[in-house]
């Protein structure tokens, strides 16, 4: 059986690493890309998979990695994110530009580089958004603007690349990670956020890794252009406080 590579950009984070573990269970070969080599080594050793150090803000580094993989790319997951929460009155143009570069432009550039191989293999693309795009939260203009663009990218790409390549997006609620640790390390704040969800807890990467692995796999034959809200019900349900 031939090896089927899935590029996981942001593979050292909680979402990317959980997805990579699930892909490995399903006989796909995750190729991890991230900036933090220490974390990459740890996950790579655990999964016995390849990793490359790369920065989405330095597209040449991603270009070299993808060229190295040749035409054996069957999927691409862009698990990179950022968090910048503040009132709009305290934001600068640079906040929005940086967030767009990390969350949106980085995904666009990676997809463009991998596109020939993805087309050849009839592959799949998985992007990540946030519940804040649909729900609308205070102090979230920076991240919601960038991730809103990711959702638009998902729909446009799904239409453009059909029927050869499937493109979908997962939009979780607050998820436990190094990036969100400054929020959820505050026990009182964590509890207050948890009870806003009909299923009252903070998300974990493995709460939606199996769905991500399915979307990237050949088992997903008929799902494209979808934004999946895996958020404990926060985006759609209202419960008594």
What are the functions of these language-model segments?
Residues 171-182:
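Short, flexible catalytic-loop segment of classical short-chain dehydrogenase/reductase
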Residues 124-149, 154-162, 174-175:
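Catalytic loop of short-chain dehydrogenase/reductase
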Residues 135, 224-241:
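Short C-terminal tail/terminal secondary-structure segment
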Residues 169, 188-223, 230-232:
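C-terminal helical subdomain
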Residues 12-13:
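Conserved glycine-rich cofactor-binding loop
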Residues 87-88, 95-100, 190-193:
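Substrate-binding pocket helix/loop in short-chain dehydrogenase/reductase
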Residues 116, 158-163, 221:
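Alpha-helical segment proximal to the catalytic Tyr-Lys
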